[in-house]
């Protein structure tokens, strides 16, 4: 049983969204990392910035409407967390600031983020509920399974919405094409009749 759980947790470890990234931020620039997050989901992160005297890096987390969820100035090393209110694309930006008189150099930024189930402390839950290690593992596996089911349900819903949008767009394009053809035929008919009357008036045709 323990071996089976180990294999399952290993698989989940490869597919579950724990993101770790490291990059270099050039002076007086900003770099943003964007991700789609479900509604009412906790997001936690840890960051660390290489120290360069005289240079400052700020970070800010916000949604697509510009609402600030978390921010801090002059960061070096720390943690942050915020709760998503609605399904949206959220972004975390790191902003470099270097005084005009100083020649800036790139700074290394590392970021690790967790969301949803991975933000829970199952060790604390086990101690509070007096659960055995195996029961804690089963609880974690149950939460992971439920979260994956919700993710797939959301993906299916978005796929259906996109399909409906495509079908509506195709219907509108077809209607517009038919309408355009009718307008062109009407214009061509009017031109023929107008030219016929014009030539008759000029007695060029009978």
UniProtKB/Swiss-Prot annotation:
Molecular-function GO term, any one: cargo receptor activity
Membrane topology: Single-pass type I membrane protein
This protein's UniProt keywords: Developmental protein, Membrane, Signal, Transmembrane, Transmembrane helix
GO cellular component, one term: cytoplasm
Location of this chain's protein in the cell: Membrane
Annotated S-S bridges: none
GO biological process: dorsal/ventral pattern formation; endoplasmic reticulum to Golgi vesicle-mediated transport
Protein name: Transmembrane emp24 domain-containing protein bai
Annotated source species: Drosophila virilis (Fruit fly)
